Amino acid sequence: MAANRTAAATLCFIGCGLAMAVIGALSLAVSSPLLFPAIGASAFLVFYAPRSPISCPRNAFLGHGIGALVGTLAALALGVVAHEAWLLSTEPWRAVVSAAVALAVAGAAMARFDVGHPPAGATTLIVATGLMGGARDIAAILGAVVVLSAVGRLVHRFSGEPFPWWAPGTVPTPPRA
């Protein structure tokens, strides 16, 4: 059992390190925020639990896409200014309401369409509170997911670990009351 944990730790170390190095280098090359906080959590899932539906590229791309879209709409609707320190703004309540509404809607949408990806919740908050925003930032978020998926595929191919691109919708259904 310890050998399996060592192999998993090694795969996480190599995969996460390589993915962040590639995404970071591309971020510098194109002067765009490809290396944003939630992509680190996505990378961990890709290399720690590659067979899980929440780790597959389908869920990562659609989850982050839903989060970015809903976060953008909430920020626009509530007048949250992108790239403004929301706690220092004159009306910080706007960002709080934007975050609450956006995460509720994005979470429900991911659950409804069976594309759950927990790090996408962080993306939703990042965009809804104005830390990132605008078409260029949204493109960077989705571009980073594509690059992460490609690095994940490459690393898993060399390791012999299966990494499905499009996992079937098998996220467990929550229990009914």
Predicted regions and their residues:
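Alpha-helical transmembrane segments and their membrane-interface boundaries
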Residues: 1-81, 86, 90-96, 100, ...
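Generic structural marker for isolated residues within well-ordered, non-membrane alpha-helices
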Residues: 23, 106, 124
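Membrane-embedded alpha-helical segments that form the functional core of polytopic membrane enzymes
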Residues: 101, 105
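Juxtamembrane/interfacial segments flanking transmembrane helices
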Residues: 114-122, 159-164
